[in-house]
A protein has these predicted regions:
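Cytoplasmic juxtamembrane "membrane-exit" helices immediately C-terminal to transmembrane segments
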Residues: 1-2
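Extracytoplasmic/periplasmic sensory segments of membrane signal-transduction proteins
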Residues: 5-108
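Short, small/polar residue-rich loop motifs at catalytic or cofactor-binding pockets
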Residues: 67, 155-158
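Hydrophobic beta-strand positions
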Residues: 73, 163-164
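GAF sensory domains
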Residues: 81-90, 170-188
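A short, polar/proline- and glycine-enriched secondary-structure boundary/capping micro-motif
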Residues: 91-95, 148-152, 181-185
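Membrane-proximal, non-catalytic sensory/regulatory domains of signal-transducing membrane proteins
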Residues: 100-131, 158-162, 183-196
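Conserved beta-strands of PAS-like sensory domains
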Residues: 114, 120-155, 164-166, 171-176
Length: 196
């Protein structure tokens, strides 16, 4: 019974950590969304946007947590990142799954399906939102590998702790090779795990 209590406490902690990370990202996005949209409507320059994204990303890394890779925007057809990144030849933001999900949801808040970030080669989700004009957006990338590291530290007894998305795909926990796989495909049965 003591083992069950400890495992339940660890699962509570894991669930709360994930929820806190995502709700913090939503709060960060909300504050910056209105600021950046105002900057755009007021005619700020691209250099001012770059400086703003860099300043906000530095704040996140220094004051908040490294779970956030940065704040970015897609402003007037230009991808604005807080650090330099050479886009690969043929790169089109419109082809990226995270952009398509945000575009589909319009001004509604979007937490994207996990994807491999091309700049950092890390598994992330984006928390983002389109501007009222329907073509510009702002987002915050959340590093899922840090959540995985946190889950690895928790004692799950003889089991393992994973975070799965709505499709049943693993987005955090376990080995990096597990990312994107479904529990069903790993265990070849549906009763091998419990959801929490």
């Amino acid at each position: 019974e003591q083992v069950d209590d400890e495992m339940n406490n660890n699962m509570d902690y894991a669930a709360m950590s994930c929820q806190n990370c995502l709700s913090d990202a939503v709060d960060i996005l909300t504050v910056n969304y209105f600021t950046v949209q105002y900057m755009h409507e007021s005619g700020h320059s691209m250099d001012e946007f770059r400086a703003y994204f860099t300043e906000q990303t530095d704040y996140l890394k220094n004051e908040e947590s490294m779970q956030y890779l940065g704040i970015y925007g897609y402003i007037d057809g230009e991808l604005m990142l807080s650090t330099a990144w050479e886009q690969p030849e043929g790169y089109r933001i419109e082809d990226r799954s995270w952009y398509q999900e945000m575009k589909q949801n319009g001004t509604e808040l979007t937490i994207t399906t996990p994807y491999l970030d091309m700049k950092t080669n890390r598994q992330v989700v984006s928390v983002g939102r389109m501007f009222r004009d329907g073509s510009n957006l702002i987002g915050v990338d959340v590093d899922l590998e840090e959540l995985s590291d946190l889950l690895k530290e928790l004692d799950a007894g003889t089991g393992e702790i994973y975070i799965v998305d709505q499709t049943g795909s693993i987005i955090a926990g376990g080995e990096p090779a597990y990312m994107g796989k479904t529990l069903d495909s790993m265990y070849h049965r549906t009763d091998a795990y419990e959801t929490y």
